[in-house]
């Protein structure tokens, strides 16, 4: 049994894909230096993993990343880590990384959820409720708070067929995935911009993100 959960009672494998920290969240540049952005991204990942780890339906959590710091943090929190083999210059690196992880994770669980790694305000119960709702559909997704992106993609007994990228919410909808309509404000609040971070902080972020943001403000 690998992954962040050790009891083996769940039937869902969670995947989080993380790019190199130095290339992440460039739209936070108006409020954070490059080094500070790396710290913020890592802290958000840690808070996301910590909240997700308490979801009883999860058998495992897998982080796929080319970044050594992200891999080390995920390992310390008990997640399975896969080295992202996606080549530099790949035209679709995020979806290809997810597909690589899906090939591995699907060997041990029948159901897979892909979650963004920048959800510092996500509550455990929000993710648990979304997974419960997703069980009614082969493929489903949770849109972000703006309705244009995707916070989570769920596949129950089906291939993921990830469509992340610009306007991913519409792309997932067109691909046949059902949009889940629960409120789940923390689950929907991924952080790409200063406005996103302000929204997450208004909901209440996890301790790692709170510490790092306070240190760099």
Swiss-Prot record:
Name the residues that bind phosphoenolpyruvate. Answer: 150, 165, 168
Enzyme's top EC category? transferase
What is catalysed by this protein?
Answer: phosphoenolpyruvate + GTP + H(+) = enolpyruvoyl-2-diphospho-5'-guanosine + diphosphate
Manganese among the record's keywords?
Answer: no
Q: Does the keyword Nucleotide-binding apply?
A: yes
Alphabetically ordered keywords of this record:
GTP-binding, Nucleotide-binding, Nucleotidyltransferase, Transferase
**Belongs to which family?**
Belongs to the CofC family.
Under PANTHER family, the record lists:
2-PHOSPHO-L-LACTATE GUANYLYLTRANSFERASE
What biological function has been recorded for the protein in this entry? Guanylyltransferase that catalyzes the activation of phosphoenolpyruvate (PEP) as enolpyruvoyl-2-diphospho-5'-guanosine, via the condensation of PEP with GTP. It is involved in the biosynthesis of coenzyme F420, a hydride carrier cofactor.
Please identify the protein, giving its name as recorded: Phosphoenolpyruvate guanylyltransferase
